[in-house]
Amino acid sequence: MNTQQLAKLRSIVPEMRRVRHIHFVGIGGAGMGGIAEVLANEGYQISGSDLAPNPVTQQLTSLGATIFFNHRPENVRDASVVVVSSAISADNPEIVAAHEARIPVIRRAEMLAELMRFRHGIAIAGTHGKTTTTAMVSSIYAEAGLDPTFVNGGLVKAAGVHARLGHSRYLIAEADESDASFLHLQPMVAIVTNIEADHMDTYHGDFENLKQTFINFLHNLPFYGRAVMCVDDPVIRELLPRVGRQTTTYGFSEDADVRVEDYQQIGPQGHFTLLRQGMPDLHVTLNAPGRHNALNAAAAVAVATEEGIDDDAILRALESFQGTGRRFDFLGEFPLEPVNGKAGTAMLVDDYGHHPTEVDATIKAARAGWPDKNLVMLFQPHRYTRTRDLYDDFANVLTQVDALLMLDVYPAGEAPIPGADSRSLCRTIRNRGKIDPILVSDPAQVATMLAPVLTGNDLILVQGAGNVGKIARYLSEIKLKPQIQEEEQHG
């Protein structure tokens, strides 16, 4: 939206004239930065604060945003509104200062809802697969020439950004259930990929509460809107009768409205047929591995079909799909001769998955595409509460690899919980007798401890949602070769 469009929006909503300067606390997060980027392109004055520079803050600076790498009361001076992420505590000095100055303080999703208010909103929710599905829907709409605005929780690799301002009526956005703030959104179309027990502190440990919140989210759709839901998921199947909106189901299940059939994976690509009611079958080549990504594609196709997008555009977008950052992200294939003296190579893949279901899907995709590879995982558990609540599931899933290195738990601000640490998890896995995990307490020693387990025909999965992505990039930069004095800054 250019300045002329902004003026038009402000004429539709005269009160928007009051909003000139928008300040984001925690602006370096992908979700926050994406919204800030769209608003910057709409002509608003953007400022924000975070603890350290990153690619998100660098992109925003290039758009004219003012970024502070501290949290101080004076940072919010002259702001019309302050937007906060769920990771920011109420005693943050900028939030306190905003309240004292009677500046409105809103959550990220509330600002996203304002962006969606006068657009055709497509919101993608669910425990797993949101980011990739959002990117797939965005890619299809872009390929069809519909020029959508999108706001994603991860880097859309084809665009090189987390968010992009389009000039059409379409807004495609990831909807985050972690703090229940997705209830602010009022989309025209909503996808729900799956529902599992995660972020249960938000829902007071009550899974029924979580399920009802998803129902409430879907009931934010207008009566003429549409819910697109994965019927393979047992919780979604249970909830379907309670959804009082038009629905389209998708999945491998025989009763799905959009059904995946004849799936096979060859290397990084999935090949399958999509059967649609009253429509020609689609023979899909998807440039993303794993059955879980076939489901994500089925959701995107269901939405695109409902919109009337041409089948050829759908197929082109899926075959050329470049994926999202840190989702089965290929970082390179490196010769092992300089690493440990062995012939052959090792592939390096970075993946954000940090829930047992996500880790399992990544392992299955790796096994399906590269069945002869020695599968090595460097895993970083994320949050002590998640490690505690899903301890047995993690232990079961992680025994499926051939070699496992484990970093300490990434706390994400949490205090340690006895028995929910990496040493305990390694011990439990070792006692099951399938593999002997290696605990890596010092991230600077990853390359040194990784080298001996590589055989010359390896696929290395760097797995987790904490700072392990930095370690993956470091391993790529040094081509897996142990350094004489490995720098600690990458950890």
From Swiss-Prot:
* Name of the coding gene: murC
Matching entries from InterPro entries are given as: Mur-like_cat_sf, Mur_ligase_C, Mur_ligase_C_dom_sf, Mur_ligase_cen, Mur_ligase_N, MurCDEF_pg_biosynth, UDP-N-AcMur_Ala_ligase_MurC
What is the protein's known function?
Cell wall formation.
Please give the name of this protein.
UDP-N-acetylmuramate--L-alanine ligase
What would be one Pfam family of this protein? Mur_ligase
Pathway recorded for this protein: Cell wall biogenesis; peptidoglycan biosynthesis
Main localization category = cytoplasm
- What SUPFAM superfamilies does the record tag this protein with? MurCD N-terminal domain, MurD-like peptide ligases, catalytic domain, MurD-like peptide ligases, peptide-binding domain
Q: Which UniProt keywords apply?
A: ATP-binding, Cell cycle, Cell division, Cell shape, Cell wall biogenesis/degradation, Cytoplasm, Ligase, Nucleotide-binding, Peptidoglycan synthesis
In the Enzyme Commission scheme, what number(s) does this protein have? 6.3.2.8
Homology family: Belongs to the MurCDEF family.
